[in-house]
């Protein structure tokens, strides 16, 4: 009788700008506080594609081969000796950012700001676009039976929306402007509505994406063409009948940030989620004299439990965001599809024995 084939650890590895390869890596052994995961679903993020195209994002530079992927879920294969809350067979969602030390930011509960944090697929740390991956067990969260692996993977972008809405103070009855109808704009829309926003208006250049935003719950949409930032602000006010209390900017485009400042109600909050140029010209005086608070967002913290509750209770529905699925073996084709701007969220299926959502 032939011996069973040894499982491989096919991994998607970026070696430098434009150099993306599928390679077989050793299956890692979990440490005492880690779990080994059989990966199931991993979403492609814009940052993954940026590392592939340019080999860097700001000061994060790919200096050695790095496995991509950080929007992920999988099944526990093996647990470390000190892990008590998980067991083999558990389905989990992975929070990609795990602090390495209990520094001042961790003590404040803002561990996302820790300069030494481990973060999947951020140099020099490997990600989880692979068959098998080990991770800090404290940052692996059990999925309820009614939450799919793909929903578990989408908790990562959903967490950005949760953190952004928290930073903006979105609450019952608010009018909210979301700039950008990409994946992050879409999850921000979903979270704002779930948190009680009375009306959410979404802006974008793409009529197709705005149609999707309308489909998943946007009250109003505004397609941008050649309007000035001031004109965009006036159109938003015209649609809502007032200025929004909260604007969440998800594009990073200079003109969109400018429009966000002009559009936000006096005393309101502008939250910057999208990453653009390091130096940006904005009408700060216009924000200052109207006490528009400008807040930054860097990833997220303390969001996975609430995201799981939102998904399990059906308070949000992220399933319509997935437009393409590829097996891990076709990862290069999947990345080319993303690069062409096709679809919204592309999901890679890492377990050859289970390609279901």
Curated annotation (Swiss-Prot):
Keyword NAD assigned: yes
GO aspect biological process, one term: glucose metabolic process
Cofactor: record remark: Binds 1 zinc ion per subunit.
Gene Ontology cellular component list: cytosol; extracellular exosome; extracellular space; membrane; mitochondrial membrane; motile cilium
EC number, as in UniProt: 1.1.1.-, 1.1.1.4, 1.1.1.14, 1.1.1.56
N-acetylalanine PTM positions: 2
Amino-acid positions noted as binding NAD(+) in the UniProt annotation, renumbered to this chain: 184, 204, 209, 273-275, 297-299
Free-text activity regulation comment from the record: Inhibited by CP-166,572, an inhibitor that is competitive with fructose. Also competitively inhibited by phenanthroline and 4-methylpyrazole in vitro.
Cofactor(s) demanded: Zn(2+)
Membrane-crossing residue ranges in chain numbering: none
PANTHER family named among the record's database cross-references: SORBITOL DEHYDROGENASE
Protein name in the entry: Sorbitol dehydrogenase
Gene: SORD
């Amino acid at each position: 009788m032939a011996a069973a084939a040894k499982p491989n650890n096919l991994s998607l590895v970026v070696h430098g700008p434009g150099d993306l390869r599928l390679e077989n890596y050793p299956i890692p052994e979990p440490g005492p506080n880690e779990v080994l995961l059989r990966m199931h679903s991993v979403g492609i993020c814009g940052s993954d594609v940026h590392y592939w195209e340019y080999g860097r994002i700001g000061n994060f530079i790919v200096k050695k081969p790095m496995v991509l992927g950080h929007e992920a879920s999988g099944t526990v294969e093996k647990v470390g000796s000190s892990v008590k809350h998980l067991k083999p067979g558990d389905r989990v969602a992975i929070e990609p950012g795990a602090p390495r030390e209990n520094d001042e930011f961790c003590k404040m509960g803002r561990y996302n700001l820790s300069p030494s944090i481990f973060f999947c697929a951020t140099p020099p740390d490997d990600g989880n676009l692979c068959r098998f991956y080990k991770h800090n067990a404290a940052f692996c969260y059990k999925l309820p039976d009614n939450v799919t692996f793909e929903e578990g993977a989408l908790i990562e972008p959903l967490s950005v929306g949760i953190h952004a809405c928290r930073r903006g103070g979105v609450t019952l009855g608010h009018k909210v402007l979301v700039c950008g109808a990409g994946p992050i704009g879409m999850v921000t829309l979903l979270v704002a509505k779930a948190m009680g926003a009375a009306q959410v208006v979404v802006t974008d250049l793409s009529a197709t994406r705005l149609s999707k935003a309308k489909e998943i719950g946007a009250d109003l949409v505004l397609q941008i063409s050649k309007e000035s930032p001031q004109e965009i602000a006036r159109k938003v006010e015209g649609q809502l009948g007032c200025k929004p209390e909260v604007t969440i900017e998800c594009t990073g485009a200079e003109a969109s940030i400018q429009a966000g400042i002009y559009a936000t109600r006096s005393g309101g909050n502008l939250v910057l989620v999208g990453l653009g140029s390091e130096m940006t010209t904005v009408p700060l005086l216009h924000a200052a004299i109207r006490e528009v608070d400008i807040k930054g967002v860097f990833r997220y913290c303390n969001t996975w439990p609430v995201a799981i509750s939102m998904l399990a209770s059906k308070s949000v529905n992220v399933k319509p965001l997935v437009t393409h699925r590829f097996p891990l073996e076709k990862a290069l084709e999947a990345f080319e599809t993303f690069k062409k701007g096709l679809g919204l969220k592309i999901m890679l299926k890492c377990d050859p024995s289970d390609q279901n959502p």
